[in-house]
Amino acid sequence: MVKKNSSKAAPATIARNKRATFEYRFEEKMEAGLSLMGWEVKSIRMGKVNLSDCYVFLKNGEAFMHGCTIIPLNTASTHVVCDPLRLKKLLLSRKELDKLAGLVERQGYSIIPISMYWRKGAWVKVEIGLGKGKKDHDKREDTKAREWEVEKARVMKKEKTHG
């Protein structure tokens, strides 16, 4: 019997903001949809996205992503002006927007895009993180912990092969 593909397959990652986890400590993550133009979807399919200097801000009860660079393809339509740094509206429920607004305004949190991925093969989604910026000593501690994990794995592997 042939096994059918699971409908809950892992989403295909388009882009990841690697600096986000280094610069911020996230307390909560959520998924948001994106309002995109046709040429942006084509460019995203080709992988021409950069999330490195990207952040989310709230204005008039809506969330917008700023700094997300989507490089237009050479074959993009000529009758549309392609702006690589156009603001992208995030599609969130009113409940989620109110929660984000409260935490950002009252407690000084930042909203940062962590990754962009395909959901069900057709919808572009963004994983956003709600967190606070790390101090320099926090970054050093994280680096030390990460290096220790690598060293520990190396020693365990060496013990396993020689022991």
Curated annotation (Swiss-Prot):
Superkingdom of the organism of origin: Bacteria
Which keywords fit this entry according to its UniProt record? Answer: Cytoplasm, RNA-binding
A molecular function annotated in GO for this UniProt entry is:
RNA binding
What SUPFAM superfamilies does the record tag this protein with? Small protein B (SmpB)
Q: Where is the protein localized?
A: Cytoplasm
GO process terms (BP): trans-translation
GO CC entries:
cytosol
Note the InterPro entries from the entry.
SmpB (IPR023620), SsrA-bd_prot (IPR000037), SsrA-bd_prot_CS (IPR020081)
What's the family? Answer: Belongs to the SmpB family.
Sorted alphabetically, which NCBIfam families does this protein's record hold? PRK05422.1 (NF003843), smpB (TIGR00086)
What this chain does, per the entry, is described as: Required for rescue of stalled ribosomes mediated by trans-translation. Binds to transfer-messenger RNA (tmRNA), required for stable association of tmRNA with ribosomes. tmRNA and SmpB together mimic tRNA shape, replacing the anticodon stem-loop with SmpB. tmRNA is encoded by the ssrA gene; the 2 termini fold to resemble tRNA(Ala) and it encodes a 'tag peptide', a short internal open reading frame. During trans-translation Ala-aminoacylated tmRNA acts like a tRNA, entering the A-site of stalled ribosomes, displacing the stalled mRNA.
Q: What is this protein called?
A: SsrA-binding protein
Whose protein is this, by species? Shewanella baltica (strain OS155 / ATCC BAA-1091)
